[in-house]
Structure formats: structure tokens, C-alpha cells
């Protein structure tokens, strides 16, 4: 539960009512650690939405109540706590069915939103590009469409804030047909954006510069690592989903190979299917990458659970079999004994600190090693000055060590991937 915020961009805050178990979960023997981990993660989600938590109501039950998720007795408890804490919004840690949402809105004094809507709200806060904003609005409308009953009445009572970003009050009060038309329009606009993205990717692929994608659970430190390796200055925040729109920057490895480093949106437990679908184009950077850096917060007690969740999402994206380097970040928060234990783990994990720079040189060498299927080679080329595209391709994918001009020819001494040199073998000259 939350009180009103001092933050200027937030008009109302939240009541956190947690029904954080799936039907039958208690009967399956869910551990106390797993439950507490879920509670802590949910608190962080609420805070990442810009909210102040005023109170919590927790519940562990064997089966979800079909009408209200938490049962009539618990509904009364939540209502009493919401009223006493003057909460504006009640946030559930589970997803609610349309029936449950309608019944809870009728029974409780504040606006009711569920886990997926909370995550969508956070995404709406961080979308900056046109594609990102279109994706968020599409995901919100598709999720809201079957849940329209009663929403207009609740929306009219709030001036904005958590659960109200993206599609506005008027939008959500329109009939199903109008929202369906808007969904159709958004899909068309996104398709246009995706065609442009596809064309840009095809131009990139014309010059064989490999892509290395950062993946990982939200708040594992991907953006901090991206900044440390590229100096790009991308927003790095302790809040969840600070990075929404993908970022691409070129870096040079110790072998002088150039690669593109991609920073992508973080994953999370029970990532809403509407988000995976809407953000599929963004996640194509993961699908197209030659190597994945699976960034993990090694100081987290739930690292193994988060690792498994990321593996699951990668498999859903069709990227589960891609070469991966496990990057154990935030090693500076561990004792020397704990650090040594990490290095002896399976799969040759790389223990680093993106914040201090510890282990980053070793990580770059490891990326080099992972890309050795296309080794860097030295070559001498004799290229007509009219072949500017050839010279540009060499500069983009490799390193020109020496350049000399003779008439209309350019003599180049280069270091580049073997595949790139192979494309221009007709310009090769014998070593002097």
C-alpha cells in the first residue's frame, strides 16, 4: 500500500496486496526462501514504478479463489488496510483474470492493478524511442481489452500515476471496437518500424561485424557493463527495467577485431506473454547475435533461479543454443573466498565488476576466443580509389594498419576477420 508521493511526476501511490502463489503451489512444497524472494522482487517492481509502499498484505494459499484470487476474508482485510493507510492503488503480485479484476474493483476502495499491468507501467516510464512507445501501448491495450469492464469508472477517479501511463483515460473508456482499431493501427505502424530495422540490420550484415548481446535478469548490471565496455553513458539504474530500448555500440577487442555490443531489456520471472510478443522485434538483437553475454548478479541469493529464468526465456526466443559466456557481475560485493568459489564454477564463468572494472580485460579476451571460428588475419590489399565501398567495409569490420597512395590505387595493410578478407581476395597482393 502506498501514500501520496512527493515526486512531481506521480500523483498517486500504491497498496501492495500480495497473492504470490499459483494454484496448487503450496501443495507442491514451495520454499520459504522462494516466497520471500518473490515478495522482495515484487516490492522492487512497485518501487521501480515510482511508488512508495505504505503497507503490505501477504497470503500463502494452496489454491487461488476463482472469484477474487485471495478469498472473501482476505479481501475484507485488504479493504480495511487500504482504507486505514489511505492507499490510492492496490497492486497484486499475481495476474488477475477479468472476473477477479472486476470483483476486486467492486470490493476495494482503490484502483486495482495486477503484476502484468505493473510491469507494463514500468515499461511505459522508460520507453524513449518511437518503437518502444508503440510496443508498450500495444501490449497495454492487448492486455486491457478483455479487462475493460469497470475500468472507465476507476480511471475517472484518478489523475494519473501508477497503472495509468500509456493509453490515456479517454482511450480506456472507449468501446472494444475502437480499441481494436487502435491495436490494428499500432500493429501496422510497428510493422513499418520493423521493416526499417530489418533494412538497417541487412546493411550491417553486409559488412561481417559480429554482434555480442548482453542478456540477463533485470537489474543484473547489464547497462553498467555496457557503459564500462563502450563508454556510451547509457542510463544505468538500480531500478528494474531502466533499459527498454536496445542500444548498439562498436567496441574493439584485444585482437583488434571490431564487434557490435548490444544492451537489451532485462528478463524477469513470469515475463508477460504480451510483452514477449510485442517486443519480439527488439529481442531480435538477441536472436541475431553471434555470442551472448549472460550477465548475472553474483551477490544475489536468487542468482540460480534468475539464471534458470533467463535460460527459459532464451529458449522461448529460439536463442537457447547460442554460444554464451556467463558473466558473474558485482564480484566486488563478495569476500575473497566467495570470489574464488565463483571462478571454480562450471562453464568457465567470468567473475567481474562492471562498477570497478575488475575482470573486464579478461572478459574481452574471452569474447575474442568465442569468435575464433572467424579468426583475425593480416593481409595486403591493392584497391582502386573508385572502390570506396570496399575500403569502407574494411574500416568497418577490421583495422587498416597502413595506407599508401599510388596513382588511382590505395595500398592497404589490414587486420580483419578471415571472412571479410575472403570477400575481397581479388584485391589481395603478395607480401613484400
Swiss-Prot record:
GTP binds at residues 216-223, 241-245, 263-266, 329-332, 353-355. It comes from the Bacteria. SUPFAM superfamilies: P-loop containing nucleoside triphosphate hydrolases. Residues 1-10 have a biased composition (Low complexity). Keywords: Cytoplasm, GTP-binding, Magnesium, Metal-binding, Nucleotide-binding. CDD domains: HflX. Its main location: cytoplasm. Its cofactor is Mg(2+). Mg(2+) binds at residues 223, 243. HAMAP family: GTPase_HflX. Belongs to the TRAFAC class OBG-HflX-like GTPase superfamily. HflX GTPase family. Monomer. Associates with the 50S ribosomal subunit. This is GTPase HflX.
